[in-house]
Amino acid sequence: MAVGTASLQDRLETWAQRLKNLTVSPLTRDYPDTQKTDSKRVIEAFESLQLPKAKLTGSSSSFIAFLTAFIILVARLTGDEDIAVGTNSNEDGRAFVIRVPIDTSESFAQLYAKVDKAYKEGSSQIVPLGSLRSYIQEKSKSERTPVLFRFAAYDAPASSQDYPANTFDTTDLVVNVAPGSAEVELGAYYNQRLFSSARIAFILKQLASIASNAAANPDEAIGRIDLMTEDQRALLPDPTCNLNWSNFRGAIHDIFTANAERHPEKLCVVETQSSSSPHREFTYRQINEASNILGHHLVRSGIQRGEVVMVYAYRGVDLVVAVMGILKAGATFSVIDPAYPPERQNIYLDVARPRALVNIAKATKDAGELSDIVRTFIDENLELRTEIPALALLDDGTLAGGSINGQDVFANDVALKSKPTGVVVGPDSIPTLSFTSGSEGRPKGVRGRHFSLAYYFPWMSETFKLTPDEKFTMLSGIAHDPIQRDIFTPLFLGAQLLVPAREDIQNEKLAEWIEKYGATITHLTPAMGQILVGGASAQFPALHHAFFVGDILIKRDCRSLQGLAPNVSIVNMYGTTETQRAVSYYEIPSYASNEGYLNNMKDVIMAGRGMLDVQMLVVNRYDPTRLCAIGEVGEIYVRAGGLAEGYLGSPELSAKKFLNNWFVNPEIWAEKDQAESRNEPWRQFYVGPRDRLYRSGDLGRYTPSGDVECSGRADDQVKIRGFRIELGEIDTHLSQHPLVRENVTLVRRDKDEEPTLVSYFVPDMNKWASWLESKGLKDDDSDSEGMVGLLRRFRPLRDDAREHLRTKLPTYAVPTVIIPLKRMPLNPNGKIDKPALPFPDTAELSAAAPRRASSALQALSETEQTLAQVWAKLIPNVTSRMIGPDDSFFDLGGHSILAQQMFFELRRKWRVIDISMNAIFRSPTLKGFASEIDRLLAMESFATSDDKTLAVQAANEPDDEYSKDAVQLVNELPKTFPQRTEAMLTSEPTVFLTGATGFLGAHILRDLLTRKSPSTKVVALVRAKTEELALERLRSTCRAYGFWDEAWTAKLQAVCGDLGKPQFGLSQSVWDDLTNRVDAVIHNGALVHWVYPYATLRPANVMGTIDALKLCASGKAKQFAFVSSTSALDKDRYVQESERIIAAGGNGISEDDDMEGSRVGLGTGYGQSKWAGEYLVKEAGRRGLRGTIVRSGYVLGDSVTGTTNTDDFLIRMLKGCIQIGLRPNIFNTVNMVPVDHVARIVIATAFHPPATGVNVAHVTGHPRLRFNQFLGALELYGYNVPQVDYVPWSTSLEQYVNDGEHNDKESQHALMPLYHFVTSDLPSNTKAPELDDVNAATALRADATWSGVDASAGAGVTEELVGLYASYLVQTGFLPAPTVAGARPLPAAQISEEQKKTLLSVGGRGGTS
């Protein structure tokens, strides 16, 4: 379609209006985004699917139909109703945005018409997307580049594997639609550092499912179109299966009684010492007898089954006695927390309508008697059968109830202490009444059932290895239903319950308490977990399981807990008061067993999957008869036999929330139950099997593993100024700020009654001082008690948090007010008490206005001390006391290998710290390097997310030192270079060669000396003490690589020198001789090191290049070949430019590129040194030099013999994959070329340079394998290395390194020297541009008349060559032999014993000789 005639400015304005207030939600991730910011994605992995056209009819096979299906899929996966995706013109392939509002009730055909119209309008007004972004950004005066779309679907008529030209940085997923004659191929490009291949494969199948289902029924509502496929269904719960509704395990109090009879003198409850009470211990017999007494009293008082008994409670053994006694009477226990205001206590009493009241003596002593308001309510509104005035279990185990009329209320019941009450209950009897929030502030009373209290404990015991020897904690809020877990779990197991004093439940002390008493199991809310770890330093290694319930659990808190309890496995349990014990679970293994597990988890821990006979059903919101497909947003329903009965006194609400299962006919369960009945006594209190679902109101998704992750509340979305805002999303991002320990966001009304976003946070004071120091600020703690003082003191942190949120959220979602608190107010249930959160008035905000900041305190940091300990551990003969702030890592004895090990240790110390290897060379002193770490810790200590990327970027500002240096070094070059018009090379040219003892250099030497026409003499620069030793080094190197002919010595001269010294360290006489004798210079030598900084490599790689050029400028005219590297182009800009060129039909980055794209910000010192070298050589070309710069990629083994350099990264990758038994899924192409072909190119360009000046010759592989193909060749030849996603592969590598069994030289992982590189983000790190190689081909064609071989078609590493290399490496002992018979046998590679011996003294890609 032709672009309209409107001006570009008019079209930009049209598009800006069209895309106003755009909703652009990302695809939910499988892994944390540790490397890229939210505004940047790298597309580097590929999946494909073929859909037979037979499943499509008519227009349903058109691109517009697939685009419509794609938009439906995006809507279903994100939950959005305003969809913007990228697409392209079917005429010229140019990209544009299509925006379509959707209604889930409209049909596919209706949406198709809307999409078709929007497509035609958009394709007729195309503007460059870069220009559109800039226009919108400038118009909105925003600091952030706008994101126009996260998803794109492109018309790719040639092939779905055509790399999409429009894979912009902000794209999560690109789908290419390539129609064929018999099938439509769908190809997906994605970033596997964020998304698993399993998720993408499911997405393609879902897209195909939408397309085929819509073809069959185009009038079906788009919200009802089925995304499910059989392979998804196999992973998800079956809502029609039997969940064993009738498998009642017995009443929890009867199980407790049986345990008491089996081991009566075993410790049951321990009340630990406090400042006001002694340490007290009670046995199972004492608790059993005491609860029997209470039970008999209640029965004698007329309490009937299911009647409520309210407990005015206190945390302690008395509460355990009260609960068990009430249950033994067949009654329902409920709890009032004395901390509640009297008015709220009355609400609970009004809802519960109890028939008995148990006052725990310690509660009345601590909080006072029931208030007059409560007492009046009881007298006027309740009909109590009995009241226990002061229940107390005395130190000797005697139970007291308090005196009435001069006699203890239990006086007539004590004689029955050894006898059970005999009250029978069943699975549908009501043992508990718990409260949860309700509308208009009135709580709902949830009636729990006996079925749930004991049903899941055997499964938990087996799954989590819980034994009778455990020590449980009693930390939950006493009126919060998780207290039931605290009490019932140990009593079921016959274990011990530890009760802390109130003073122990606070920061620092709680950790000390757990350590002191050796707790092994704890149940926590996330808020209580934050109290446990906040400010704590005590380690508690005995704790092996922590079960979290009640709120969202985030990775930061898990990491903090495992930092104190390395043996604790953390179990996140999703459930509600209404589901009772029927919950889902997701287990995080202990740090001791799997150090890196949390690294690859997202910030919010998923809900997981249902425990025994519990199902998490994510139901389609538009068609409840269907489960959601993987990744689709739906509402979470819990299906289980252990659900609560319902809400007390609210049958209508119960009917809305507790629903009969519509997926199955319930009659089948009744028939099964009747067949299994044995007329057990409890069946009289069982209404029969009820297949019910609890509607949670939470939104969620299935993950590719079949687990469930929560994605917010169906009702937790607020609108402010017309924008939809998810409060949970704000909280998630704010929690990732390193100094935020706790946080919560609310909507409050300001003075004008306008809704205002307010975030509250508790600063992490352990990091406050170092953070201020890193900012150059001083702590203003002169008045930090009141609101004004807190606002003023933490203003820098508030501002920083706001800036942090601006990088994560749209502007409208950034809270207007951010308030620091010393601690979060908690309600008695251990949750944040939101109504108690303060809101500052205008005067307070004004008084807290900023004051002048002062300089930061100068003090030795904790980071420096820790770092010194790490250095002392690694560097021989050094102790931490010997290391001062100005001591250098290298001066102390450190080197690059120890630096790699240091980074490994740092990751263990600080979990996932990710700092560039360059940092240690840039800042080698203790103080300097600690500062580098602090920059990252300021963004990393709680999260491995986008925040860390910002810190990495701040610590590694774009570096242009190398390019500025190159510009200055131009002054060192000769002004002119000699020229002549006759043939430059005679019949017997002399070539000066550097780097001849390296892998490539030796092969260049072989090629030169074996040429017949012309016969060539070689002068090789070798680092040695004498020319005899220099020649011997050349001889040994060649023998090691399988070639040497003693006859070569007649044409070979070795001269002693050093690249890093002026004039290569040659004497003036030798230098003068060379200037007059040499016809061509091949400058191949360099110091190759991937972590050394530019300054270290400069003498050999840059100044050495200047000396090579000076050699060319003196004496007779010479031709020049400079061996460079594609690392000089290692910038994202070149990858993007390459994609554009390929899409336009080109071959890749031109050899004529001016390198301006990498003038700033090259990441390695080696690449920087090669950039500077190239800059100087090109300038020499402008001054008269004739020559070529040869840019090579990976130089692999000889294509004939298989001789291979074992120090090469790719060869190390082969061995590393074999060592861990896995290979990563990396779709990038790899520019690999056999060494003999690279050598031929170098010589061809040296002998056949351009007529004038200097050009570039790219060394490009033909064919160019992908990483998957290269590593997959191992399986072809019998190595058992299945392919997995990169993140699991990286985790396996970390585990291999961490397990401590591979520290010796033989078993140390092959990738250890490159550990940081391969575990940071290998898919992105290995993404490289495609390269045009016209000049290389031209030189090879010209050389054919000399060499007799036309190699201009190029060469590359094939799967067959990988087999040859593997055979060679097996012969040398570098690789083990294949373990099974592969599809192909290893080719034969012959290697002599002499070669094996000489190989021990040779290595490296290129020497410094």
From Swiss-Prot:
Chain positions with O-(pantetheine 4'-phosphoryl)serine modification: 896
UniProt-recorded name of the protein: L-2-aminoadipate reductase large subunit
Pfam families: AMP-binding (PF00501), Condensation (PF00668), NAD_binding_4 (PF07993), PP-binding (PF00550)
Intrachain disulfide bonds: none
Organism: Penicillium chrysogenum
EC number: 1.2.1.31, 1.2.1.95
Keyword field: Amino-acid biosynthesis, Lysine biosynthesis, NADP, Oxidoreductase, Phosphopantetheine, Phosphoprotein
Pathway field: Amino-acid biosynthesis; L-lysine biosynthesis via AAA pathway; L-lysine from L-alpha-aminoadipate (fungal route): step 1/3
Subunit structure: Heterodimer of an alpha and a beta subunit.
Cofactor details (free text): Binds 1 phosphopantetheine covalently.
Residue ranges of domain Carrier in the record: 858-937
Stored InterPro entries: AA_adenyl_dom (IPR010071), ACP-like_sf (IPR036736), AMP-bd_C_sf (IPR045851), AMP-binding_CS (IPR020845), AMP-dep_synth/lig_dom (IPR000873), ANL_N_sf (IPR042099), Condensatn (IPR001242), Far_NAD-bd (IPR013120)
